Amino acid sequence: MTLFALAGTPLATPRACHLFYGFTHEREARPVFTGLVEALGTVEAMTPAGAGARLVLRESVLAPQLTLGESVCVNGACLTVVAHDAGTFAFEAGPETLARTDLGVLKPGDRVNLERSLRLSDRLGGHLVTGHVDGLGRIESRQTDGEWVTTWFQCPEELAAQLVGKGSVAVDGVSLTVVGVRRDGFSVMLIPHTLSVTTLGFKAVGAPVNLETDLLAKYVWKYLSLTNPSVPV
């Protein structure tokens, strides 16, 4: 399976790198991320907007570089920039996003993980993250071992079934390696760098997290559901 179609695409393109399956046109492309957080943003405002909400974030480094319509991964959810200035930028989240993620409970002062979409010239240091959150999990426990922290997350059984030890999972948009898996949860080992540059360094036990399983695991899961009716979709 071809993941990227590079033919005819300049390596120096702006941040509009997308996940391709074979040959595609630009209008069919989708943003993709790596799960490597670039910055922590601060919620400036969260206000109702029709059936959804308008989220305004403050972050002085990324804001001047953004363009209208650009995709940004916010705590693991792919959102589109609808306004920005030198220090703030805004997104609009629909009812599906609010129902499937923890964005709906954000309040002014909360911190969020931010990552711009991947460019063709970038290194894939984490794993392919689409920004389409599969569901919510919750921090169950944190155990410190020196500078490292082993963290267990509770999650829906259908998501845990898509995880394997040494596989990848995105938690609040952070690419992590799975250590242990059980029927309704999984564990990871958080290194000092991850603890210092992402929200996972200060989120407390009981806090919700956005989860996205590995893209290839989704296709395997879908195939199994078609061949075995007992596998939930």
Model-derived regions: residue spans:
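Conserved loop->alpha-helix
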Residues: 20-233
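Extreme N-terminal basic, low-complexity initiation segments
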Residues: 1-12
